Swiss-Prot record:
Family recorded in the similarity comment: Belongs to the ABC transporter superfamily. ABCB family. Multidrug resistance exporter (TC 3.A.1.201) subfamily.
The protein's name in its UniProt record: ATP-dependent translocase ABCB1
Summary of activators and inhibitors of this protein: Translocase activity is inhibited by verapamil and is sensitive to energy depletion. C1orf115 regulates drug efflux through modulation of ABCB1 localization and activity.
Membrane-side (Extracellular) residue stretches: 67-115, 208-214, 316-329, 731-754, 852, 956-971
Enzyme class at the top of the EC tree: translocase
Compositionally biased tracts (Polar residues): 640-652
Assembly and binders: Interacts with PSMB5.
Glycosylation sites: 73, 91, 96, 103
Gene designation: Abcb1b
Keyword check for Zinc-finger: no
Misc. comment: In mouse the MDR gene family includes three or more related but distinct cellular genes.
TM regions (residue ranges): 44-66, 116-136, 186-207, 215-235, 294-315, 330-351, 710-730, 755-775, 831-851, 853-872, 933-955, 972-993
Length: 1276
């Protein structure tokens, strides 16, 4: 359905299969969860809390209408007393015994009524606490379960589901949408029942006290209910659209932040901002429409309410004058109905919150309810006692779910005997990796059977199957924990001795032991702090500790240097003994000893045999071997020593912040455990120390909408003043009946006052509409602006900011999703209500001082107590909000890591481990929610009960003032009405305290990010922009340490020079500083000492954007964006519109055009999240095309051909050789054959240049370079 299609991220078009499915589903799905469905995760205790909370809310809702009974009787007492007092005052000049008796009896009667008020207040104190705290407790418990269930559901989905769903949205749903559910099913439900009960009790009391008048007023009530119901329905629809748009924006943000180095290197910040802004604009427009709809509904409701007042008093007057009712009975009926209808008005924010929650829950519950066809948590399925390891693929056909038109396997037949090693060879994208994925049952074949020991793997228990398989993939993923913990992901019960044994076998022991903290070293997000070779060896160790029956090696040694590869290959050869092994390798020298080599072509196996047999057949394998042999004159099929092995202090990392653009120094992962704890505590200290911003600072963010805010404030002030004006009119009507006027005068006065009510209704319609519309629009613009500004500021930061663990993708996307909506919580509609309530209270107090200052002074003492309750509540909740925010960021980080690395988690069968980690991270917010429930309950009940106590004091003292002839009852009523409505408004305002508390915390974080200016400012317009760039690069005495590891030197006085048009090759052992050279040239960091020059100008003097625009980079494991192939290639140059002809030309140069042209959607084919729909070789060639379309002056190649098969590599290498012509080029490569023609080869060791010269010169020196070449020759 379109609802789903809107959630698919970047591209507007989707795969045709999904499109067809969408239309079909549109009719089947509803956009909101059912009312009772919202509480599907409530257990008996939650239900008990909700039942008791509802009972308390019902009692609470009944107490206020009961108060009106007391009030009616009290009014009759007053009017009778005043009627007897006035003639006495008129007729006597001196003291009168009748007057004294009347006065004393009035005071006695009022004392009794005061006790009633106090008793009702005490009841409210208890039930209001129970109502709020129990509903908050129940909500906190359910949200805790929903978060866990949702995360479990995500972990339980099959890989095919992730292929057709935008994973970027899932984190937004885990934060923003779940918090919307929390808002909707907590205390607001209690308030809803309270309001409904007040409505019902009000009408019941109205009927009992005076059914005639009640029926007349009721004539208007259905219209009020109808407008509310219609509004709620429209609101749900708008809310869904708004959530979809924000989820899409969240997906964009996550994708961009996860690939931040790629975005920065290609200057894509503005393009990404525009893409993000497009989704925000959509959400804003929906929000404004929602505000307009809501405003019209509220305006109509108030118009109808005031019209009913006019009708009530007009008809009530007739009933009093005909002696059917007393004035007290009229007021009892009127106020009971008034409270009932007003309580319907109070339903609005509660209905809105619940409607929002229902909309948010729809997608979440849909994912929870989705039953995967491959269920990794299922206990069903066969679990054989022993596995021999005989594998068979029989007539297997397969298409990926996201590209159903593209056939990958077209009838694959393959047998692997127990203990055999079978090598799969063939061109990139022919189906080799797909075979490995089907073996793990990440997907099921469309036709045919995959079997183990003759058993169809679909009948075997999924978890059992995956646990007997060890996988090492081409792009290994490590998790943000220690090296030891990463290896333990292979098998949970593994001992430290077994870990050490595995890392020795994987040739990782030496580099680990050289680290200050050895196995306790943190590897960073996605292993970003290690070089590719180090990551690969840890991944191999992780596979070996599983002691698997079946070993799947997909380019397992591609990231290793020559020396490491030889040792690791030997370890893998040893590990293969007694195991069934499937190997995929582009370097054919690593598979020549395989028992069977299977040649793939077009999704089927076209030849099988051992190396010698296939060489004699002279088919596909022979052709690949010959191509590779010709290409590798120095070291056939091998890497050069020197990119990624041991303690890499600077290597161009394959997975940097999940953006494999630049290899980061291993030393930046050198955390002691206590160091980690220290930094975490520092993080907390930093968060705590952020000063909470003032309301005016938050308002300043909305200042450009001042015309809207001004109109909104004026309308809110008018709406606030209408209540005290109502008090004047109301007191005058009561006053009419306490005077001894004739009937006709009374009728005329009452008719006039009734007309005033109608005028007030018309004014309210206009002012409530403009109040809602202007504040609503300003609030939506604010939300959009804040999200945009924060995202823009994030993209502005330098790389060192992203290096900080607290700025992980998960944390940043969580902040983006939740902070902006929290700030809106202090603005928009809530600000309107607060302004209105302040105006209400302020005007009420001023009027009261004019008409009865003595009584007002008493009330002015009481009101601060109500306000104090609100302030205490806000302070306490602010502290809780800060703790919640920090802890939910940690949860968000875990969730993001799990979602983004889902394939690895599934292969390792570690879904439950991540669930446990996620559940543990939710404990602090859960405990805080439990505490918060009681805090909110106590403060809410206090502010509510204080109103009743203030009534008791008001009327007791009022009776005394009337008895002493210091005030008339008319004025007592005026002061009472003005202050009652003002106090109710103050109490209502305090209920916004939790939202305002959250808003202040969020605003503080937002402003800190927005105001942060980085040292290397990507947005800066300063700096030189030479008209001509030749491409002379010079490093002069450069010293550099990474900002997060200031005590570990990386470059120690490096000096080198490359002239324009020259190719410079950097070689050396891992950790020597090769990659740091490239990072400093990209100006991701600045050197601590020494200088980097470009054409004789220090690069610090050059404009950053201009500098990067002239550099083109191709990395070992490139990141692609979830958009079309054409858009990915065009991303190479974001400064202009790249024509389709240029895209095609670049694709042809990168040897990818033919493949693209064979796809149904050709260049419009989406590549999936991070390019997952493509093979490694296809991704690499698209990345090369992306760099070539840029036409850079300086080309930076980090293992640019490492992921390619032999045939592709040869053609691409030729393309790169051609691309290098006339350009300065810096190359880092394992295969020395690819750099032997370089103009200058520089050997770096320990951050300094040790050797430099041409290939022949360095061979003649017989130094380090010569040793590398010899090592390569032995491997050939």
């Amino acid at each position: 359905m379109e609802f789903e299609e809107n959630l698919k991220g970047r591209a507007d078009k989707n795969f045709s299969k999904m499109g067809k499915k969408s239309k079909k589903e549109k009719k089947e799905k509803k956009p909101a969860v059912g009312v009772f469905g919202m509480f599907r995760y409530a257990d008996w205790l939650d239900k008990l809390c909700m039942i008791l909370g509802t009972l308390a809310a019902i009692i609470h809702g009944t107490l206020l209408p009961l108060l009106m009974l007391v009030f009616g009787n009290m009014t009759d007492s007053f009017t009778k007393a005043e009627a007897s007092i006035l003639p006495s005052i008129t007729n006597q000049s001196g003291p009168n015994s009748t007057l004294i008796i009347s006065n004393s009896s009035l005071e006695e009667e009022m004392a009794i009524y005061a006790y009633y008020y106090t008793g009702i207040g005490a009841g409210v104190l208890i039930v209001a606490y129970i109502q709020v705290s129990l509903w908050c407790l129940a909500a906190g418990r359910q949200i805790h379960k929903i978060r866990q269930k949702f995360f479990h559901a995500i972990m339980n989905q099959e890989i095919g589901w992730f292929d057709v769903h935008d994973v970027g949205e899932l984190n937004t749903r885990l934060t923003d949408d779940v918090s919307k559910i929390n808002d909707g099913i907590g205390d607001k439900i209690g308030m809803f029942f309270q309001s409904i009960t007040t409505f019902l009790a009000g009408f019941i009391i109205g009927f009992i006290s005076g059914w005639k008048l009640t029926l007349v007023i009721l004539a208007v009530s259905p219209l009020i209910g109808l407008s509310s119901a219609l509004w709620a329905k429209v609101l749900t629809s708008f809310t869904n659209k708004e959530l979809q748009a924000y989820a899409k924006a969240g997906a964009v943000a996550e994708e961009v932040l996860a690939a931040i180095r790629t975005v920065i290197a290609f200057g894509g910040q503005q393009k990404e901002l525009e893409r993000y802004n497009k989704n925000l604009e959509e959400a804003k427009n929906v929000g404004i429409k929602k505000a307009i709809t809501a405003s019209i509904s509220i305006g109509i409701a108030y118009l109808l309410v005031y019209a009913s007042y006019a009708l009530a008093f007009w008809y009530g007057t007739s009933l009093v004058l005909s002696n059917e009712y007393s004035i007290g009975e009229v007021l009892t009926v009127f106020f009971s109905i008034l409270l009932g209808t007003f309580s319907i008005g109070h339903l609005a924010p509660n209905i809105e919150a619940f409607a929002n929650a229902r909309g948010a829950a729809f997608e979440i519950f849909k994912i929870i309810d989705n039953e995967p066809s491959i269920d990794s948590f299922s206990t069903k399925g066969y679990k054989p006692d022993s596995i021999m390891g005989n594998l068979e693929f029989k007539n297997v056909h397969f298409n990926y779910p996201s590209r159903s038109e593209v056939q990958i396997l077209k009838g694959l037949n393959l047998k692997v005997k127990s203990g055999q090693t079978v090598a799969l060879v063939g061109n990139s994208g022919c189906g080799k990796s797909t075979t490995v994925q089907l073996m793990q049952r990440l997907y099921d074949p469309l036709e045919g059977v995959v079997s183990i020991d003759g058993q169809d793997i679909r009948t075997i228990n999924v978890r059992y199957l995956r646990e007997i398989i060890g996988v090492v993939s081409q792009e290994p993923v490590l998790f943000a924990t220690t090296i030891a913990e990463n290896i333990r992901y292979g098998r949970e019960d593994v001992t430290m001795d077994e870990i050490e044994k595995a890392v020795k076998e994987a040739n990782a022991y030496d580099f680990i032991m050289k680290l200050p903290h050895q196995f306790d070293t943190l590897v960073g997000e996605r292993g970003a702090q290690l070089s590719g070779g180090q990551k690969q060896r840890i991944a191999i160790a992780r596979a070996l500790v599983r002691n698997p029956k079946i070993l799947l090696l997909d380019e397992a040694t591609s990231a290793l240097d020559t020396e490491s590869e030889a040792v690791v290959q030997a370890a893998l050869d040893k590990a293969r003994e007694g195991r069934t092994t499937i190997v995929i390798a582009h370097r054919l020298s690593t598979v020549r000893n395989a028992d069977v080599i299977a040649g793939f072509d077009g999704g089927v196996i076209v030849e099988q045999g051992n190396h010698d047999e296939l060489m004699r057949e002279k088919g596909i394998y022979f052709k690949l071997v010959m191509t590779q042999t010709r290409g590798n004159e120095i070291e056939p099929g091998n890497n050069a020593y020197g990119s990624q092995s041991d303690t890499d202090a600077s290597e161009l990392t394959s997975e940097e912040s999940k953006s494999p653009l630049i290899r980061r120094s291993i030393y930046r992962s050198v955390h002691r455990k206590q160091d980690q704890e220290r930094r975490l505590s520092m993080k907390e200290a930093v968060d705590e120390d952020v000063p909470l911003v003032s309301f005016w600072r938050i308002l300043n963010l909305n200042l450009s909408e001042w015309p809207y805010l001004l109109v909104g404030v004026l309308c809110a002030v008018i709406n606030g003043c209408i209540q005290p004006v109502f008090a004047i009119v109301f007191s005058r009507i009561v006053g009419v009946f306490s005077r001894d006027d004739d009937h006709e005068t009374k009728r005329q006065n009452c008719n006039l006052f009734s007309l005033f009510f109608l005028v007030m209704g018309l004014i309210s319609f206009v002012t409530y509409f403009f109040q809602g519309f202007t504040f609503g629009k300003a609030g939506e613009i604010l939300t959009k602006r804040v999200r945009y500004m924060v995202f823009k500021s994030m993209l502005r930061q330098d790389i060192s900011w992203f290096d900080d663990h607290k700025n992980s993708t998960g944390s940043l996307t969580t902040r983006l999703a939740s902070d902006a909506s929290s700030v809106k919580g202090a603005m928009g509609a809530r600000l309107a209500v607060v302004t209105q309530n302040v105006a209400n209270l302020g005007t009420g107090v001023i009027l009261s001082l004019v008409y009865g200052w003595q009584l007002t002074l008493l009330l002015v003492v009481i009101i601060p107590l109500i306000v104090l309750g609100g302030i205490i509540e806000m302070k306490l909740l602010s502290g809780q909000a800060l703790k919640d925010k920090k802890q939910l960021e940690i949860s968000g980080k875990i969730a993001t890591e799990a979602i983004e690395n889902f394939r690895t988690i599934v292969s390792l069968t570690r879904e439950q481990k991540f669930e446990t980690m996620y559940a543990q991270s939710l404990q602090v917010p859960y405990r805080n929610a439990m505490k918060k429930a009681h805090v909110f309950g106590i403060t809410f009940s206090f502010t509510q009960a204080m109103m009743y106590f203030s009534y008791a004091a008001c009327f007791r003292f009022g009776a005394y003032l009337v008895a002493q002839q210091l005030m008339t009852f008319e004025n007592v009523m005026l002061v009472f009405s003005a202050v009652v409505f003002g106090a109710m408004a103050a109490g209502n305002t305090s209920s916004f305290a939790p939202d305002y508390a959250k808003a202040k915390v969020s605003a503080s974080h937002i402003i800190r990010i927005i105001e942060k200016t980085p040292e290397i400012d990507s947005y800066s317009t300063e700096g030189l922009k030479p008209t001509l760039l030749e491409g002379n690069v010079k490093f002069n005495g450069v010293q550099f340490n990474y900002p997060t590891r200031p005590n570990i030197p990386v470059l120690q006085g490096l000096s080198l020079e490359v002239k324009k048009g020259q190719t410079l090759a950097l070689v050396g052992s891992s950790g020597c500083g090769k990659s740091t050279v490239v990072q400093l040239l990209e100006r991701f960091y600045d050197p601590m000492a020494g200088s980097v020059f470009l054409d004789g100008k220090e690069i610090k003097q050059l404009n950053v954007q201009w500098l990067r625009a002239h550099l083109g980079i191709v990395s070992q494991e490139p990141i692609l964006f979830d958009c079309s192939i054409a858009e990915n290639i065009a991303y190479g140059d974001n400064s202009r519109a790249v024509s389709h002809e240029e895209i095609v030309r670049a694709a042809k140069e990168a040897n990818i055009h033919q493949f693209i042209d064979s796809l149904p959607d050709k260049y419009n084919t989406r590549v999936g999240d991070k390019g997952t729909q493509l093979s490694g070789g296809q991704k690499q060639r698209i990345a090369i095309a992306r760099a070539l379309v840029r036409q850079p002056h300086i080309l930076l190649l980090d293992e640019a051909t490492s992921a390619l098969d032999t045939e592709s590599e040869k053609v691409v290498q030729e393309a790169l050789d051609k691309a290098r012509e006339g350009r300065t080029c810096i190359v880092i490569a394992h295969r020395l054959s690819t750099i032997q023609n370089a103009d200058l080869i520089v050997v770096i060791e320990n951050g300094k240049v040790k050797e430099h010269g041409t290939h022949q010169q360095l061979l003649a020196q017989k130094g380090i370079y010569f040793s590398m070449v010899q090592a390569g020759a032995k491997r050939s």
